[in-house]
């Protein structure tokens, strides 16, 4: 089996680009390929001094505090033979199941030590890197990749980008310092792990945001001369709204906010609102979207064309795919669950301490858990199976369709939306970064009650208000059903 030393050699041998990090104290560092290998070696030596001996394929759970420390700790542990499970610092679910180390240990190492890169070349690296994901099920599982799959994913996506308008923009900016790509996601996210390696392989400088919030992203775009940036759709919507409020009289508020250099935005991780894509494209910034999953990596990439604003693009030509309808039949087009045969480019599910193969239909098709309309080779997202709300008459209602109809309001600077969908009253709270507590949710509900005391719940509304499951917000915000009755103390706002 190949090991992660091959990824290190593939990426950091004879390449001109740099990795630019902001550490936990917001210090900025630029590292070329030699610097990167040097730091990995020094950090691994520091780990050995703390009792992390050379181990072959023992699992370590790495608490990912920031991208700078996570990057070097991950490769340092791999260089000692460990397999690494990257974990969100807010998640304690497996702390007792694995030997666990915080990425902050990186800051204990003396980075000006003497080093011999030849020692790094001799090491037998670990074989696996793992991620947590709720995947298709709605509850958290662990998925792990071997280096062969990671290298093939990088190669496949790289070839797709080279046939996309993204590459044309890169070619207009010849030097790596002119084609800087900003990563706005943590490395424990599959996008935050893979996209920097893919873009670095295209001779780009990679800049890692320290704080993964809109103001920090805006600052980095302007300060680091960013050509392209990728992240989740909610970020682009928040930045769009901030620009329109900050520059209400500008003909192009997004350009006022982000400057003239940026030309590429890549959204992924969930559905991007049509209006958001249109606004960026109208501002002169190409907006691409891609579809993928923790379990199988990236599957599609769109154009930046107003005529193709609703699709998630076409699935990569090296993959085979079908639509699984409600009757369990595999179809070449139509509406249903997308199933994909990526010809062996899968993660493995990590269960009982061992990587195990995913369950596949007919031994080859992976069920994505996502509902699409597949038409003329393009994907049109409808929703996730796990998020479908079934109405009283048996109709499937997708949360995305509800969200698209909501109007934004603010209470104590907390953004929320209220609207209607087929007789349901909906309250949607934006909770990027997990900022809002349950008390904040209750405060908004009390606010809605106070300002709408005179309203009575209409019988046509079915006495339902959509908030979040059990009143606890996820890191992205969310929707769930709270059933009310005519005598409830909670009253709903008037809807259109």
Regions found by a protein language model. Name each.
Residues 155-180, 187-252:
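Conserved AMP-binding/adenylation subdomain of ANL enzymes
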Residues 29, 46-90, 183-184:
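Conserved AMP-binding/adenylate-forming
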Residues 32-33, 128-162:
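Conserved AMP-binding A3 loop
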Residues 306, 314-315, 329-364, 378-379, ...:
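Conserved ATP/PPi-binding loop(s) of AMP-dependent carboxylate-activating enzymes
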Residues 226-231, 240-309, 412-414:
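Gly/Ser/Thr-rich phosphate-binding loop
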Residues 342, 369-456, 495:
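AMP-binding/adenylate-forming catalytic core of the ANL superfamily
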Residues 1-21, 38-39, 123-128, 495:
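A short N-terminal helical cap/helix-turn-helix that marks the beginning
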Residues 18-54, 67, 95, 147-148:
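Conserved AMP-binding/adenylate-forming core of the ANL superfamily
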